[in-house]
UniProtKB/Swiss-Prot annotation:
It is found in: Nucleus; Cytoplasm, Cytoskeleton, Cilium axoneme; Cytoplasm, Cytoskeleton, Flagellum axoneme. Disulfide bonds: none annotated. It comes from Bos taurus. Microtubule inner protein (MIP) part of the dynein-decorated doublet microtubules (DMTs) in cilia axoneme, which is required for motile cilia beating. May play a role in the control of meiotic division and germ cell differentiation through regulation of pairing and recombination during meiosis. Required for sperm flagella assembly. May play a role in the assembly and function of the outer dynein arm-docking complex (ODA-DC). ODA-DC mediates outer dynein arms (ODA) binding onto the axonemal doublet microtubules. Belongs to the MNS1 family. The lineage of its organism: Eukaryota, Metazoa, Chordata, Craniata, Vertebrata. This is Meiosis-specific nuclear structural protein 1. Residues 61-215, 245-361 form a coiled coil.
Length: 495
């Protein structure tokens, strides 16, 4: 029994061990199942999370799409609003441009009417046209003066050419005279040379004579030596020969002296002739130079006189033209002043007459209005009284009706008075509008006047008549350079 228990115990232990192992196995399986479940749950959770994320992303995408669509719709509406605003602005701008264009055309038409109807602008245009005519006339006069000056210049050039030709002829004559003088000098030189040669020949003849004398002396000596014995006999002959020789020597000396005197006289005559010729030539050249100087001075005086005469004629013509122009401008200015004074007096009379007529008309209108009001009041009162008399029978009601009628009449009179005042106010506003329009016209006239001055005054400096500039501001408006030139021109005209 004990062994059985022990066996059982062993079996139990074994069973227990098996149970334990089985339990462990079950526990492991349970753990595996739990792990599988956990893993499946995690996978499921992951799938759910993934689906949730996808759903959330889809929701976000849907919301983003809705936001994008809403933003696109807003942008489209904003673009539509901007396009409508732009179209409205463009339409407004086009309207403004059309309005400005209409106003510009209206202003241009008004300016055209003012230019056509303004007496001041017409007068200024007449003055500018007159200034252009004066400028053209001055240009023609300057052209004529230039032609005259060119003719004078050509005459002076011809005179200068004639003088140069005359001087050239004088130089040629002087050169020819110099050649003649040189020929004369050469002739004198040749003559002196011939005289010198003659003197040499005479000297040679004298030397030959001396040689002959020496030969004679030698012959005499030889004769004396050879025939000393015959000296006594030949003494006379020798004395005669000596006397002959002495006479010959005397004659030779006299002939030499005479020849020398003749040569000196001839040289003196030649020198005197040369001096005389030189003096004559100097006198002739002096006379020629004096004649040339006289002709040159005469021509110069003639040209100077012609220039002075032409300048004097030009100055006289310019002075006459200036005097005529000044007289004409003075007459025009005087006539203009008279016309302006007459126009001013006429306008004053017209304004005074208009004022008196307006006052009289106003009195008549007021009187007529009062009379009409009184007549109307009486007529209405009579009408209302007649109506009330017919309609009403008791004494209290006519009194009340009379008061009502009086108030009605006064109301009608007040309405008529208000209508009258409204008409007068409208007339006043119309008069003020006319005044503003006249002021605008005056401003346009002034602008057009200044525009004409800016366009033409600088081109017509020196030719503008009096009265073109109203005051110094018109001159200053054209610039400092124009003002200085105009003042300088005015000072020259005053001088």
């Amino acid at each position: 029994m004990a062994s059985i228990r022990r066996t059982l115990s062993f079996s139990e232990r074994h069973q227990k061990l098996v149970d334990i192992n089985y339990c462990k196995k079950l526990h492991v399986e349970a753990l595996q199942r739990l792990q599988n479940q956990t893993r499946d749950q995690m996978v499921q959770n992951e799938n759910d999370d993934r689906a949730e994320r996808k759903r959330f992303l889809r929701l976000l995408q849907d919301e983003q799409f809705e936001l994008d669509m809403e933003e696109a719709i807003q942008k489209a509406e904003e673009n539509k609003r901007l396009r409508e605003l732009q179209l409205a602005q463009e339409e407004k701008l086009a309207t403004e441009l059309a309005k400005l264009k209409r106003e510009s055309l209206k202003d241009e038409k008004l300016r055209q009417q003012v230019r056509e109807n303004s007496a001041e602008l017409r007068e200024l245009e007449k003055k500018l046209k007159a200034a252009y005519m004066n400028k053209e006339r001055a240009a023609q006069i300057a052209e004529k003066d230039a032609i005259k000056y060119g003719q004078m210049k050509r005459d002076a050039e011809i005179a200068r050419t004639m003088m140069e030709e005359h001087e050239r002829l004088i130089k040629e004559e002087s050169a020819a005279e110099d050649k003649r003088n040189q020929a004369k000098a050469q002739y004198s030189h040749d003559l002196e040379k011939q005289l010198e040669e003659q003197g040499k020949k005479k000297q040679e003849a004298y030397e030959q004579l001396l040689k002959e004398k020496l030969m004679i002396d030698e012959i005499v000596r030889k004769i004396y030596e050879e025939d000393q014995l015959e000296r006594q006999q030949r003494l006379e002959k020798m004395n005669t020969t000596r006397r002959y020789i002495e006479e010959f020597q005397k004659e030779q000396a006299l002939w030499r002296k005479k020849k020398r005197e003749e040569m000196e006289e001839e040289n003196r005559k030649i020198i005197e002739f040369a001096k005389l010729q030189q003096q004559r030539e100097e006198d002739r050249m002096a006379k020629v130079q004096e004649k040339v100087k006289k002709k040159r001075l005469q021509l110069k005086n003639m040209l100077t006189q012609r220039l002075e005469e032409m300048l004097r004629q030009r100055e006289d013509l310019e002075q006459v033209r200036q005097e005529l122009y000044q007289e004409e401008q003075a007459e025009i200015y005087k006539k203009k002043l008279e016309e302006e004074a007459e126009e001013k007096l006429r306008k004053q009379k017209e304004l005074k007459q208009d004022f008196m007529d307006q006052m009289a008309l106003k009195e008549l209108i007021l009187q007529a209005a009062k009379e009409e009001e009184e007549t109307f009041r009486k007529a209405m009162l009579a009408k209302f009284a007649e109506d009330d008399r017919i309609e009403l029978m008791n004494a209290q009601k006519p009194r009340m009706k009379q008061l009502e009628h009086k108030r009605a009449v006064e109301k009608l009179i007040e309405e008529r008075r208000n209508q009258f005042l409204a008409d007068k106010q409208r007339e006043l506003e119309e008069w003020q509008w006319q005044q503003r329009r006249q002021g605008c016209i005056n401003a346009i006239v002034e602008e057009e006047r200044l525009k004409l001055l800016k366009e033409h005054a600088t081109k017509l400096l020196g030719y503008l008549p009096k009265g073109v500039f109203k005051n110094e501001d018109d001159i200053d408006m054209l610039g400092e350079e124009f003002r200085k030139a105009y003042q300088k021109r005015s000072e020259i005209c005053e001088k």
